[in-house]
Amino acid sequence: MVLVQTGSSMPEPLYKSWIDAYHKEAASTQVRYMPVGSAESARNILAGSGDLGGGDAPIPETQLHAANKSVLELPAVLIGIVAIYELPGIKGELKLTGPVLANIFLGRIKTWNDSALTRLNPDMNLPALPIRVFHRTDGKGSNYILSDYLCKVSPEFLAIAGRSESPKWPAGQSFQRSQELVNQLHSTPGAIGYTELNLAVSSGVRMASIKNAAGEFVKPSSQSIAAAASAGGGKKNEDFRVSLTNAPGKESYPISSFTWLYVPAVAPDPERGRAVAAYLKWVYTSGQKIAQEQGYATLPADVLAKVAAKASTVH
């Protein structure tokens, strides 16, 4: 049997590792992954297309109600969105606050030696270089996570761009896929953009530390992302749609999130439903171990137990 899964391009490397490993254990089931983006994946699942979907944002309530269909939104792993930049020959680690990052993406801070940046980074010899803003195209989960955070720390960003998979960016160049953005940033002095932590690490791009809700500058890492999940209220929330951005706690990385699997509670075909349930059972056991080995922050134990229990109801 071939199961069709759509979803975000950010966790694609992990999902492909899962799919390969699962096929070795369950040879009769293949999973085909199509990285169509979070918004498109949600539309597909609500329309009855595909066996499971996924994305880096909760499905909008209006779409869920309009579809009149029971879809489970199950956290798969934790991810962090990191601010990445290209400043050749400039030593040091860039520090940013949420409001400063918001003003960069609003096009209000235009050069790297702007006083808002030099105040935060007195030890970096920031150049009089134009800032080139890179962002993702519409319908992307990374847009949602970043804009969710920026809307919490910047009233101006909330008013102008908004919290969305398709923010109204007033400035910058857009990219369809995360890897395209990273590749272009590498070869563009003065560029700033964002991507998922593991892709940033594997690509060797520089990442900024972000000031969190407790006033600490925190580097993105699987540990600081896990700290945000532990502090961010995911434990208490049974529907798993909770936002983890700007979480409390000194060690919390502030642009952290679940990435979700969108799963029809009842499959149109019982045999396919059983196959999806078996795959999910594997994801929340062996799959979590693989995610940890690949450097992802896995679900806290109490959240994992609740998610696995919910996943077992799929049929």
Please state what every model-predicted region is:
Residues 1-315:
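Flexible loop/hinge segments at secondary-structure junctions
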